[in-house]
A protein has these predicted regions:
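Short acidic-glycine-tyrosine-enriched beta hairpin
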Residues: 43-63, 148-168
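Catalytic core of non-heme Fe(II) oxygenases with the double-stranded beta-helix
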Residues: 9, 22-26, 101-118, 124-133, ...
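Residue-level marker of beta-strand positions
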Residues: 23, 53-54, 128, 158-159, ...
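Ligand-binding loop in jelly-roll beta-barrel domains
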Residues: 7, 48, 59-83, 164-190
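Glycine- and acidic-residue-biased ligand/ion/polar-headgroup-sensing regions
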Residues: 19-22, 29-44, 127, 134-150, ...
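A short, N-terminal "cap"/entry segment at the start of jelly-roll beta-barrel domains
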Residues: 1-10, 70, 74-115
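Conserved hydrophobic/aromatic beta-strand scaffold that supports enzyme active sites
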Residues: 1, 13-17, 34, 54-56, ...
């Protein structure tokens, strides 16, 4: 568990591992659920979702999740704006990448709503990005390689959350990096608050 606010029904950010043959009862996500499949195959009422699939199940949506072979998910619960009601299903393995703001940076937008943006960002080896601030904070999950800034080096599996108005100057070394990044959400009015 990376972050949890609340008791039994909580706003949470975590890695969730389904053992092979796992099956859960149908349930409603009253405040929404965001999923990135990291490994294996996650299944629900909408089909089978292999590694690389990004899902947004909006507030009020329901499903019966399962995994025949097992899977590992990055999950964010109860972190939707009340008017963010559009389901999203993106197979990131099939989506095109866009050129980023500097050479060596490629971006795959996943979702944007009221100033909150989520994307995958691919950093080629030895890429530098200018120092910048995040007025609404920033959250990163390192999916591959090593992401770096002046505060440290963050290998695959690292989760970072930087507060509102935090600043950094990110770079990569010889490994490059692939990251999930969300910006603008800290301090925003979300249904799980």
């Amino acid at each position: 568990m990376f972050d949890r606010v609340g008791a039994e029904v909580a706003r949470a950010t975590s890695l969730v591992r389904y053992a092979p043959g796992s099956r859960f009862e149908r349930h409603v996500h009253g405040a929404g659920e965001e999923i990135l499949v990291l490994d294996g195959v996650f299944s629900d009422d909408n089909g089978d979702h292999a590694a690389g699939v990004y899902l947004r199940n909006p507030p009020g949506s329901a499903h019966e999740p399962q995994s025949r072979e097992g899977c590992l998910l990055f999950v964010k619960l109860r972190q939707f704006a009340a008017d963010d009601l559009q389901p999203v299903r993106i197979d990131t393995r099939a989506e095109p990448w866009r050129q980023g703001l500097v050479p060596g940076l490629s971006v795959m937008p996943l979702h944007e709503h009221n100033g909150i943006s989520t994307a995958l960002v691919r950093w080629a080896p030895n890429t530098r990005f200018h120092a910048h601030a995040h007025p609404g904070g920033e959250e990163i999950l390192v999916l591959d390689g090593v992401f770096r800034d002046e505060f440290g080096a963050y290998p695959e599996g690292s989760w970072l959350r930087s507060p509102r108005w935090s600043r950094h100057a990110p770079v990569t070394g010889l490994e490059g990096a692939l990251i999930y990044v969300k910006v603008g959400h800290l301090g925003a009015a979300l249904t799980g608050d």
